[in-house]
Amino acid sequence: MQNIIFEYTLTSLQKFKDAGIEVDFVQIGNEITNGLLFPYGKIKNYGSDYQKFFDTAKFLEKGILATRQIFPETKIILHLDCSGDLNRCLWWFSCANQFDLDYDIIGLSYYSLWQGKDLRL
């Protein structure tokens, strides 16, 4: 699965480059709080933080590596949907940092219907 992610990302971004399109930002996955490409990259609910996050991190690494290979200066976004849960965000990015993921921007979704209208999140 890791190689598929790498090749797909590489091929997709190469098409942009071949068309003369510069890409400023790439978001690896979408709302990946619980992982990506379920069930393979789902964050586990057992084991150490390292074990829980391992598959997600390896998938993200491949997408990031392919992006950097085609567009080295492109900003990488990791996007979660838990902006109303500070502890979850802190845990998630502490895990991402344990794996030394190469990202530039933290993206967070905010849904007032579920997270309330208190903007002091």
Identify the role of each PLM range.
Residues 11-49, 77-79:
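Active-site groove signature of glycoside hydrolases
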Residues 1-28, 52-66, 93-99:
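An active-site-proximal structural segment forming one wall of the substrate-binding cleft
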Residues 82-83:
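Cytoplasmic membrane-interface segments at the C-terminal ends of transmembrane helices
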Residues 54, 65, 69-75, 86-121:
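Glycoside hydrolase catalytic-domain groove-lining segments
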